[in-house]
Regions:
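Solvent-exposed alpha-helical segments and adjacent loops
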Residues: 1-175
Length: 175
């Protein structure tokens, strides 16, 4: 008998976008903890409902057993995949493992000093030292979907649906 194992490296935003995974692993979303702001805006609620509706359309079941909180401190001891709406809770911002590329409307890109392809063969400080730093700002709406491994459980994922304004939330719901 031949058994096949199926593995996927998480977090993978493609499988989230296409199938709602890892949240859709349990069709009723019983392994999901949604973290929302204390006073969510209409756009944040629309983003949440759009995300849950999309996952439900993949599983064929409504999200009847998910947990929801507006207290970011409650996520530390939960054995659940986290879905963050609106902003990253401060309890996650302090984690050194999380490399967030989006902070409000700014992000940065590093370009190494080394300009040839041998960095993987002969790694040195030039391969890691930035030659330039580019700040990216926007006066228009911004939205981001980011994913990372949960800092509380290496078998769990976090997906954050972030927007800086009501128009940013529209970008998320129309994506």
């Amino acid at each position: 008998t031949l058994f096949r194992s199926h593995f996927i490296a998480l977090p993978d935003l493609r499988v989230f976008a296409n199938a709602g995974f890892p949240y859709s692993r349990m069709a009723d979303l019983s392994d999901t903890l949604v973290v929302v702001p204390k006073a969510p805006t209409q756009g944040q609620v629309a983003t949440l409902l759009q995300a849950l509706g999309g996952i439900g359309s993949q599983t064929g079941l409504a999200a009847i057993n998910l947990q929801m909180t507006d207290d970011g401190n409650q996520i530390k001891n939960k054995d659940a995949d986290l879905l963050l709406i609106g902003a990253i809770p401060s309890s996650l911002k302090d984690d050194t493992k999380i490399n967030l590329l989006v902070e409000a409307t700014k992000s940065w890109v590093k370009m190494p000093m080394r300009h040839y392809d041998l960095a993987s063969i002969y790694p040195d400080d030039d391969a890691r030292t930035p030659n330039t730093r580019t700040d990216i700002t926007s006066s228009g709406p911004m939205a981001a979907v980011i994913g990372f491994q949960s800092p509380y459980n290496d078998q769990r994922s976090v997906v954050a649906l972030l927007a800086d304004s009501p128009r940013g939330n529209e970008l998320l719901t129309n994506a």
